[in-house]
Amino acid sequence: GSNATAVWAAKLGMNLQSSTLKDDETGEPFHIQQAKQIRAYRQAWAEAGHTRQPRVSVSRSIFALMDDRDRMYFGSSRNESDSVGYLDEKTRAIFGRSYAAEPDKLIEQLKKDEAIAEADTLLLTVPNQLGVEYNAHVIESILKHVAPEMGWRDRNA
């Protein structure tokens, strides 16, 4: 969606879920545009005078490369940059990059994502076609090897 849609949602008192696609309104990298969208949403929320705190979530495809299987699925075909396209003849959209790297590199990359820093919640998109067992591995790898360093989860959890 657009920044205007996020502002509209804030005025109505709705929480914001911003996924991996938004209108390309400035030509800047996806994470910067999404962070600006979140800031516009929060400002509109404050101006509307709502009494509760809003919730904002963003979605990301994040894969910690832990073994040969991870490298086979995500290591060589990493989409390390945003993609741009048109939803219709007037609407230019930007699709956020995927993150796939060894945990230490992944942490460095994720710390630079402004929208992740602005959000209250991070939703992980997982490749459900690869099955429950593999997706449990993907999520566990993030929880154990990335989340503690990002401050998302207690190291002892």
Each model region followed by its residue ranges:
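Active-site-adjacent structural elements that line small-molecule/cofactor binding pockets in enzymes
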Residues: 1-157
